From Swiss-Prot:
SUPFAM superfamilies in the record: S-adenosyl-L-methionine-dependent methyltransferases
InterPro entries: SAM-dependent_MTases_sf, UbiE/COQ5_MeTrFase, UbiE/COQ5_MeTrFase_CS
Molecular function via GO: 2-methoxy-6-polyprenyl-1,4-benzoquinol methyltransferase activity; demethylmenaquinone methyltransferase activity
Pathway this chain belongs to: Quinol/quinone metabolism; menaquinone biosynthesis; menaquinol from 1,4-dihydroxy-2-naphthoate: step 2/2; Cofactor biosynthesis; ubiquinone biosynthesis
CDD domains per the UniProt record, alphabetical: AdoMet_MTases
Record keywords: Menaquinone biosynthesis, Methyltransferase, S-adenosyl-L-methionine, Transferase, Ubiquinone biosynthesis
Positions that bind S-adenosyl-L-methionine: T59, D84, S123
Catalytic activity of the protein: a 2-demethylmenaquinol + S-adenosyl-L-methionine = a menaquinol + S-adenosyl-L-homocysteine + H(+); a 2-methoxy-6-(all-trans-polyprenyl)benzene-1,4-diol + S-adenosyl-L-methionine = a 5-methoxy-2-methyl-3-(all-trans-polyprenyl)benzene-1,4-diol + S-adenosyl-L-homocysteine + H(+)
Protein name, entry field: Ubiquinone/menaquinone biosynthesis C-methyltransferase UbiE
Keyword Cell wall biogenesis/degradation: no
Function of the molecule: Methyltransferase required for the conversion of demethylmenaquinol (DMKH2) to menaquinol (MKH2) and the conversion of 2-polyprenyl-6-methoxy-1,4-benzoquinol (DDMQH2) to 2-polyprenyl-3-methyl-6-methoxy-1,4-benzoquinol (DMQH2).
The encoding gene: ubiE
Organism per entry: Campylobacter jejuni subsp. jejuni serotype O:6 (strain 81116 / NCTC 11828)
Amino acid sequence: MQKQEKIIEMFNQIAPTYDKANRILSFGADVVWRKKACQRVMSLYLKKDLKIADIACGTGDMIEIWQESALKMEKNILNIKGIDPSSGMLNVAKEKFPNVEFIEAGAQNLPLESQSLDILSISYGIRNVVERQKALSEFARVLQKGGILVVLEFTKREKGGFIAACRDFYLKNILPSIGGIISKNKSAYEYLPNSIEGFLSKEEFILELKNAGFEMLDYKSFSFGVSSMFIAKKL
């Protein structure tokens, strides 16, 4: 089994308990980070009528937050799609949001027309894409000129110190144990800290975005560098 297929199968296995585990393990902070990202994009992008796709959508958390943010910012979502390669995750998403179109596909091969989107989001999923640069090129292809890409991701810590040490201890020791209890799959939650450590630094990822045809608009670090928000415009 190829690396990407193994990752997809892992998410299939933890899909039934994914939402519960996320809320507990992040102490609800992931919802706050998502809301801040969506609201920031809505404030930067001036069009009122929007076509949005959420890639690696999982169980659909971002779909709901996009809808809430549009209502709050007096925007109109003409169409919103959720795309994910995990059938298990999509089964949960479809139950939660029966009126939303969900598509089983990978980020590196999107079944979307070129220049068809205003906004594309991917939250805590880009580090799980093996062909990441191909995926970024796909994001640029499906976005209209001036369209917005927003990426939320766990990134490597850039500073040492007590807070960084606490973060590492939590990720490597506490999170896998609690995640394993909730999901009955400890190895899936051991994968998380390893995937973060194997991901890019902030500067490296920004360079990849630029090479894919994007211009950075905003960057923000949340919760002492635990999570990072990248907002970029397609040139």
